[in-house]
Amino acid sequence: MNIVKNSTLLWKNICFIIEETLIHEATHTSIDAYHYPDRETDGAAWIDAVSKDDGCYISTYARDYPYREDLAELMPLYVAVRYFPDRISSDTRDKILSCNLNRIQYLDSLKLDMSLYQN
């Protein structure tokens, strides 16, 4: 019985990692080019949101590669905060918002089609 329980937990963790990775990579392919400087736009609105967040980054990877990884690192957390807040602790939610509030508001302003995550 314990093996089955552990296998189920392992499978849930694997599925979460896969979903998070797919969101991260999909952000690279569908969003990056429109919001970073030197791509389709000058990135001014994104840069403004980042500066209003006092240069705080959600991960060292995002901090080290801000015009390549910041959006992709944030997007799974954005989905969690906006569409599945019951799946994260209030402490985690507060940490995400305290570091990225302006970026999250920027993503909200884009009116992205997130119907996949809505009931």
Where are these regions (language model features)?
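Active-site recognition of the HExxH zinc-binding catalytic motif
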Residues: F16-H35, A72
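A structural motif
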Residues: S30-V50
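Metalloprotease/metallohydrolase-associated module, dominated by Zn2+-dependent proteases
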Residues: A44-N119
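Soluble non-cytosolic domains of exported or imported proteins
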Residues: N13-I17, T21, A62-Y67
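Active-site scaffold of zinc-dependent metalloenzymes
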Residues: M1-E19
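Mature, folded catalytic cores of secreted/periplasmic enzymes
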Residues: N6-L10, H24-T29, D53-D54
